[in-house]
């Protein structure tokens, strides 16, 4: 009898059959850029299912067992039909999505995927220079971005159509090796301006140059011989042809 062993005792015949056995393996894979955001679980649990019903207790996968496990000595068939084995991860890992690939014959792989969190750094540029009174303001400036003290990017910034100076560094990693990255910005030196950085906003200040204008009243009248000299006169200062301030009095 195929697949059976036969033992004859006198006139009695005994046929024996050993049900087939199988094994099922599972491996845990992490797709998270080497745990960049530090969210990876230290351990997960996996449940084996036989024809949709839980088989045994969940098993733990972790670094100690290389995130892999094999169920051995499993029955191949039940009620004359081949058993379909599947696996599922117990619960969820916060911040991850889970996919299961493979089969009982080749082994299952449970992949947890996390896309590292991204951020943008935005800032504004303001000028404190009396509306560029002295014509010193440049047409463009350079802003440099640093990640934990190391330069990561730079950007040339100009005024937009409304005259506003803004910049943005996008698609930046929020974490590195599980620790939040500290981003800072600097500005290349702007001649004659001082720079103050507040967070990601940059303010450049320039003190317009100052000058002075003097006037002296002289009398050419032979020392007021005829007594016509005025006791006081007034003088008006002009800037580019327009009166500047009030007239001032000159007298003895």
Give the role of each language-model region.
Residues 1-252:
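Solvent-exposed loop/turn and edge beta-strand elements of beta-rich ligand-binding domains
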């Amino acid at each position: 009898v195929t697949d059976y062993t036969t033992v004859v005792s006198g006139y009695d015949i005994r046929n024996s059959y050993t049900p087939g056995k199988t094994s099922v393996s599972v491996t845990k894979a992490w797709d998270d850029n080497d745990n960049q955001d530090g969210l990876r679980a230290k351990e997960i649990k996996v449940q084996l299912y036989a024809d949709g019903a839980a088989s045994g207790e969940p098993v733990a996968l972790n670094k100690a067992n290389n995130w892999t496990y094999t169920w051995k000595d499993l029955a191949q068939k039940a009620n004359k039909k081949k058993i379909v084995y599947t696996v599922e991860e117990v619960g969820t890992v916060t911040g991850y999505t889970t996919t299961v690939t493979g089969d009982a014959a080749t082994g299952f792989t449970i992949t947890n995927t996390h896309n590292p969190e991204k951020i943008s750094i935005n800032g504004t540029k303001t000028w404190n220079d009396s509306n560029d009174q002295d014509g010193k303001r440049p047409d463009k400036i350079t802003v440099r971005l640093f990640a934990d003290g190391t330069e990561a990017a730079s950007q040339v910034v100009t005024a937009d159509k409304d005259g506003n100076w803004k910049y943005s560094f996008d698609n930046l990693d929020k974490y590195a090796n599980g620790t939040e990255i500290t981003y800072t910005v600097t500005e290349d030196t702007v001649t004659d301006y001082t720079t103050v950085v507040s967070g990601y906003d940059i303010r450049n200040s320039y003190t317009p140059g100052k000058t002075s204008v003097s006037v002296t009243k002289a009398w050419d009248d032979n020392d007021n011989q005829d007594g016509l000299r005025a006791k006081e006169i007034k003088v008006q200062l002009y800037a580019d042809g327009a009166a500047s301030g009030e007239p001032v009095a000159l007298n003895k």
